[in-house]
């Protein structure tokens, strides 16, 4: 029997609250930030207070609780009546598999909040295409816009134009990190908040991990899909700020398309037999590093091998490469929340008549290794490996040979 829309909403609600309130420190901090920003209250109001069958009435107000009594006929869990708002997400690599869970997050938030969305932008980090799509969204009367700010200055005017037209704009996944000396002379567009990873700081944490894995004086390769774009360049800047002077460092551009990245890594590997560390700052390059080592049958140092390797994000091949010993680690930045939370932030801004902002949420830099990979072996909508709302076990969770 097919589930009703309300049953699906309740299922999403339970999963989202669980997703942001798991017990590790970064997620507890995220939950605290959400609560301070008014987001959890909005989630609970939209999801339903009681997570039981059907809706439950709102609690009666009292001087101790500070909760006002509900209006007659009000049912907790109902979204306040509003037009069907359209939210446009402008992305820099629209077909990249990293953003599959991001799109699921947008879909789920729109289902819960009775909104529509459009996913558009560039497939190859082309800023002009992104700006054109943003201007089109403004002219076509979008109710809210979320944009990955991958380049200084380019998004200033369209962001201000949107705000002038009464359209809220939030940044997600990428912003201009002024804590990175390479970007300190720039500024961010006048968006209302940013939801995503703290990019430069994440790179510095990554650099410390390299120091622990690779002997000083060795050759280290840093792979980056698109040098100079603000979604990943700050990571490599952060890494280099920590490891410079310790290694011979090769920075290798791999290209915006996942299909090209592994070829670039293979070419580098074949011409540098002395390399002792291979690290990537984007999802496709990370997958490529693990795949190249797998093809050559070379395990990483934490698995008894000779080369250290790691990167970012949780593509299915990356997860399996960690399990099988061809990557030492990867970093989870929770792409699902980078879709869900901007949608919710725009909704709260609109429903509150501009009261709920600014909102800045760091979605984290959680190191995933063989010792804590187990939860990620489940097929999960929240990591992009399934469409199901409840994570389920898979048949590929055990180590394979090679």
Swiss-Prot record:
Subcellular location: Cell membrane
Record InterPro entries: Bact_Solute-Bind_Prot2, Peripla_BP_I, SBP_2_dom
Record-stated family: Belongs to the bacterial solute-binding protein 2 family.
Complex formation: The complex is composed of two ATP-binding proteins (XylG), two transmembrane proteins (XylH) and a solute-binding protein (XylF).
Gene Ontology MF terms: carbohydrate binding
Gene Ontology cellular-component annotations: plasma membrane
Phenotype of gene-disrupted mutants: Deletion of the gene results in a growth defect on D-xylose and L-arabinose.
Organism: Sulfolobus acidocaldarius (strain ATCC 33909 / DSM 639 / JCM 8929 / NBRC 15157 / NCIMB 11770)
Protein induction: Up-regulated in the presence of D-xylose, L-arabinose and D-arabinose.
Membrane topology summary: Single-pass membrane protein
CDD domains attached to this UniProt entry: PBP1_ABC_sugar_binding-like (cd19965)
Keyword set, alphabetical order: Cell membrane, Membrane, Sugar transport, Transmembrane, Transmembrane helix, Transport
TM segment ranges: 38-58
Function according to Swiss-Prot or TrEMBL: Part of the ABC transporter complex XylFGH involved in the uptake of xylose and arabinose.
A Pfam cross-reference name: Peripla_BP_4
Keyword Thylakoid (UniProt): no
Chief site of localization: membrane
Lineage of origin: Archaea, Thermoproteota, Thermoprotei, Sulfolobales, Sulfolobaceae
Protein name, UniProt field: Xylose/arabinose-binding protein XylF
């Amino acid at each position: 029997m097919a589930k009703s829309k309300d049953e699906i909403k309740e299922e999403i609600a339970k999963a989202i609250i669980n997703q942001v309130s798991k017990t590790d420190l970064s997620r507890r901090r995220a939950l605290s930030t959400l609560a301070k920003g008014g987001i959890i209250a909005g989630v609970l109001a939209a999801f339903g207070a009681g997570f039981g069958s059907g809706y439950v009435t709102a609690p009666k107000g009292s001087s101790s609780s500070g909760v006002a009594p509900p209006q007659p006929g009000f049912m907790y869990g109902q979204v306040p009546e509003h037009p069907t708002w359209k939210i446009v997400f402008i992305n820099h690599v629209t077909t990249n598999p990293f953003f599959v869970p991001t799109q699921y997050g947008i879909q789920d938030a729109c289902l819960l909040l009775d909104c529509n969305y459009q996913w558009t932008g560039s497939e190859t980090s082309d800023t002009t295409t992104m700006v054109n799509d943003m201007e089109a969204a403004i002219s076509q009367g979008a109710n809210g816009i979320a944009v990955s700010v991958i380049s200084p200055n380019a998004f200033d005017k369209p962001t201000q134009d949107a705000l002038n037209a009464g359209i809220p704009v939030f940044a997600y996944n990428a912003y201009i990190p002024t804590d990175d000396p390479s970007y300190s002379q720039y500024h961010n567009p006048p968006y209302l908040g940013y939801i995503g990873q703290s990019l430069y700081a994440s790179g510095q944490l990554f650099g410390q991990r390299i120091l622990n894995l690779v002997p000083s004086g060795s050759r280290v390769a840093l792979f980056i899909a698109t040098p100079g774009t603000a979604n990943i360049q700050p990571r490599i800047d952060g890494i280099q700020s920590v490891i410079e002077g310790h290694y011979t460092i090769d920075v290798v551009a791999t290209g915006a398309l996942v299909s090209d990245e592994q070829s670039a890594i293979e070419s580098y590997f074949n011409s540098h037999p002395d390399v002792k560390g291979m690290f990537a700052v984007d999802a496709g390059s990370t997958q490529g590093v693990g795949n190249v080592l797998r093809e050559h049958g070379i395990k990483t140092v934490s698995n008894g091998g000779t080369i250290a390797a790691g990167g970012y994000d949780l593509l299915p091949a990356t997860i399996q490469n960690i399990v099988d010993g061809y990557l030492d680690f990867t970093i989870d930045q929770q792409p699902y929340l980078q879709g869900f939370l901007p949608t919710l932030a725009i909704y709260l801004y609109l429903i509150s008549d501009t009261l709920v902002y600014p909102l800045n949420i760091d979605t984290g830099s959680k190191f995933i290794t063989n010792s804590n990979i187990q939860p990620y072996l489940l097929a999960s909508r929240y990591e992009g490996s399934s469409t199901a709302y409840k994570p389920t076990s898979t048949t590929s969770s055990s180590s394979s040979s090679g």
